[in-house]
Amino acid sequence: MIVSAANNIANLQDEINKLNVFPVPDGDTGTNMSLTMQAGKNAVDNFNGGLTECADKVASALLRGGRGNSGVILSLFFRGVTKELKGLSEASPADFARAFKGGVESAYKAVRKPTEGTVLTVMRLCADRAAEIADSGITDAEFFAELLANAKDTLAKTPDMLPTLKQAKVVDAGGMGFCVLLEGMLSVLDGKGEIASHAGSSSEAGQADFASFNTE
């Protein structure tokens, strides 16, 4: 799942960069999130260990490789997730729901003045949705499909939460990056397979997703 997520965001980093207007329009959110996830991917590529050990490797690598504000927030989210998955050989939707809650708490603590309408909001409302459906008897694939749908719905509303985004007629870059990561994970869970790396180019699916967030 981590490899697929890392590949997906690497493929779409340039498109994410184009959305980057907050907190400063430096056009590097996609790059920073991609480089951060690449560190996690490298840590577990060809790794065949258990869930806990895999999660620990990813979290440690992300913390060491976190780039920029978005990368640091992402790395701390995964650190919180890892703490909740510790000791598990496999994870159910209920386990993932607790992990997402832990990830959000960890990410929010890292930001002195959290701003709504950013990736933090997308993460938080995604975790809230996870808690709502955790015990509904759905599969992991159905669970992540619900989370992705929720994240996209929240992302579409970010311009209404943050005036800078509305003025630029874009959605939040970090929030889009988080959606792209979930999309990569879901691809593995729902049987479509691991997304291949085509760094430097955008997949047709990715382009379609971005087109759906045209705020003009």
Predicted features and spans:
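N-terminal loops that bind phosphate or other acidic moieties
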Residues: 1-216
